[in-house]
Amino acid sequence: MTLVPVTYKGGIFQHDIVVDLIEDLGGYVVQKHVLAQEVVLQCFVPREDIELIREISRPLFGEVTDSPLVGTEIAVVSMSLEIHHLPHPSCDIAEYVRRLGAKSNMVSLARGPGKRIAGLNDEERDVINEHDIAVYLLGNFETCIEYKMPTLRRGIEVPIVLCGGPDIEVLKKIIDPPVDGYVGNVGRFMR
């Protein structure tokens, strides 16, 4: 029996039927969120029983979706809370991984902006290392990313995915030693 991660979203009315079914089939609920009249269950269920759970949840107006990141904690690291660093791309990335089942936390650095003063303090480093993976969201400027990244990765023991404005090829060229993943063309762009 192979367990796969799924998310159930539906009304709170009679959601216990779905919870009991999941447990009876040999699966388990990782997290349960009750939001007003809606419930969200992140769970692991047997692969061969997903269609049965979908059939049972249909009359309850529930939907079952694949969620490959259930049980994963991801730190989305932003350079500051300022308007040019945090709100748009950081929130988009955090919401995207949340929809795939991950638990995302925003970490904004006290000394992130500026090439000269950029750095992590011990508390920030410890918080980032508590996660399964860290997504660093840096800016649009190659020189800034190249200069800051060695300082910002010092002491980080979890895999790092680097997001920035330059293309993937440019990010791979300017980061040494390499990080675990790159996502280019992410940031604030003129429209």
Task: List each model region and its residues.
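Short amphipathic alpha-helix segments
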Residues: 9-30, 52-53
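Generic non-transmembrane alpha-helical segments
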Residues: 17-25, 56, 60, 96, ...
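Short, surface-exposed ligand-recognition loops at beta-strand->loop->(often short) alpha-helix junctions
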Residues: 4-14, 81-86
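Conserved short beta-strand edge segments in small beta-sheet-based binding/regulatory domains
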Residues: 28-34, 55-76
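Short, low-order "capping/linker" segments at domain edges
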Residues: 48, 72-94
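Conserved mixed alpha/beta catalytic, RNA-binding, or beta-rich assembly cores of soluble enzyme
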Residues: 86-191
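Short beta-strand-to-loop capping motifs
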Residues: 6-10, 41-49
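Surface-exposed aromatic
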Residues: 36-40
